[in-house]
């Protein structure tokens, strides 16, 4: 959640992109609810990695976690140094099974987690991948 949402202006001038409401719920709330629904284990903590969005955003994110019976942890990424750095900033929360998701991406989590695998990456095939990271599969 550390990005600025420049492509959704003017909406993101006052609201961070993941907190923009989409049919009554914020994008991040929908994402978190979908992920919690596919997890077979109890979710104890939901960590949100954010830039400098302010205390109201912290409260909103903690409420999303609380409403799902989890502790909401807010971690700050002070410099926009990429996804790996953002995850590193949240290293204290990386215990046990972990799901990493982009808070501004809408998708329906209609899959199941397979605990037999050490790691899983969910990807989507798109026509023009030039603006994205690319995953090659066999």
Language-model region placement:
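Short intrinsically disordered, low-complexity coil segments enriched in acidic
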Residues: 1-3, 46, 135-138
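N-terminal nucleotide-binding beta1-loop-alpha1 segment
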Residues: 1-13
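Active-site glycine-centered loops adjacent to acidic/histidine catalytic or metal-binding residues
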Residues: 3, 104, 125
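Conserved N-terminal catalytic core of the sugar/cofactor nucleotidyltransferase
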Residues: 7, 21, 25-106, 111
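Conserved beta-strand scaffold positions in the cores of enzyme catalytic domains, especially
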Residues: 19, 74, 119-121
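Conserved core of the sugar-phosphate nucleotidyltransferase
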Residues: 107-138
């Amino acid at each position: 959640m550390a990005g600025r949402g420049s492509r959704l202006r003017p909406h993101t001038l006052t609201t961070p992109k993941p907190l923009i409401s989409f049919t009554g719920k914020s994008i991040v709330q929908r994402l978190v609810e979908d992920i919690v629904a596919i997890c077979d284990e109890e979710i104890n903590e939901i960590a949100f990695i954010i830039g400098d969005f302010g205390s109201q955003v912290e409260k909103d994110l903690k409420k999303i976690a609380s409403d799902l019976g989890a502790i909401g942890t807010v971690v700050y990424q002070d410099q926009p140094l990429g996804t790996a750095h953002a995850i590193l900033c949240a290293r204290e929360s990386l215990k046990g099974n972990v799901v990493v998701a982009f808070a501004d991406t809408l998708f329906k989590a209609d899959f199941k987690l397979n605990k037999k695998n050490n790691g899983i990456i969910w990807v989507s095939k798109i026509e023009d991948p030039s603006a994205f990271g690319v995953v090659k599969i066999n």
